[in-house]
């Protein structure tokens, strides 16, 4: 998809050393799912640079402000959480633990995809 292939190499790289408020605004107030998706997928650049804070913070926005997320947004958030977990699995586990029960199932499944089977089952039992 063009959004996924272009937003983090372009927008993410451009924002690497700048204020990232734009991504939060897109995630929270994007008029289309594609604008909202850009808000989270652009954080891939930061994840690859070891900067995970924005990914977790924007993921939190989707949990708090979007009661019925489109499945493409659930998948994107789960994907970026999984990528963040590849850099810091303990941080992802700690982030997920209090949220798994309120996360959309698709988002949770994507985020724990690389966990060992026993851990995956644990989080799935916490989930909806």
Per-range role (PLM):
Residues 1-128:
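Alpha-helical scaffold domains
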């Amino acid at each position: 998809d063009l959004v996924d292939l272009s937003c983090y190499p372009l927008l993410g790289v451009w924002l690497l050393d700048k204020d990232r408020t734009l991504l939060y605004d897109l995630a929270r107030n994007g008029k289309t799912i594609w604008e909202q998706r850009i808000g989270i997928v652009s954080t891939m650049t930061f994840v690859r640079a070891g900067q995970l804070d924005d990914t977790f913070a924007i993921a939190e926005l989707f949990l708090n402000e979007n009661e019925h997320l489109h499945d493409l947004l659930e998948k994107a958030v789960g994907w970026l959480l999984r990528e963040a977990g590849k850099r810091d699995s303990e941080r992802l586990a700690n982030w997920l633990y209090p949220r798994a029960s309120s996360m959309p199932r698709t988002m949770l499944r994507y985020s724990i995809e690389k966990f060992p089977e026993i851990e995956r089952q644990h989080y799935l039992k916490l989930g909806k």
